[in-house]
C-alpha cells in the first residue's frame, strides 16, 4: 500500500499490491461500474464489503422503481445532512443533470424548504426530509407515500438513503475533497 494519501486521507492500493481477494473485489466493482469511483476505492480494502456494496449501488443505477429526478431528491437530502464534500458535489451536478431545477437542488443542499409539483417527487422530498431530520415519519406522510410509491418505492428510497449515508460517512472519514481525482488506474 502507498504511504502517501491519494484520495483525501486514504492511500489507495495499487492493483499489483492488492491481495487476491482485493483484486477479485476490484475486478467485480470495475465490471459493475466500468470504473472505480468514490468510496469503491476504499471498499476494495474490505473485499467482502465491496462485493455487497457494488451490487447494491448497481441496483440504484438501473431497473429500480425511482426516476433519476426522484433518486437525486432523496440522495441530495441525505448528503446535505452529512455534508461530505465529494459525494455532495457529485450529486449536486447529478441532480441538475437529471433535470431538477437549480433552485430546488440548491435549496435541498442548503437545508431550505422547497416543494415539487410532481406528486411522487413531493412525497419523496417529504419522507426523505422527515427521515433525515426527525428520523420519524408522521402518519399522513406515511399514507401519502404508500399511495404514491407503494412499498417497493418506499423501500427503494429508504435503502438508497442508507446506502448514501454509508457513502457520505466513508468519504467524510477519509476527508475526501470535492475535486479528489484519486490514483490513476
Where on the chain are the PLM-derived regions?
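Hydrophobic alpha-helical segments
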Residues: 1-185
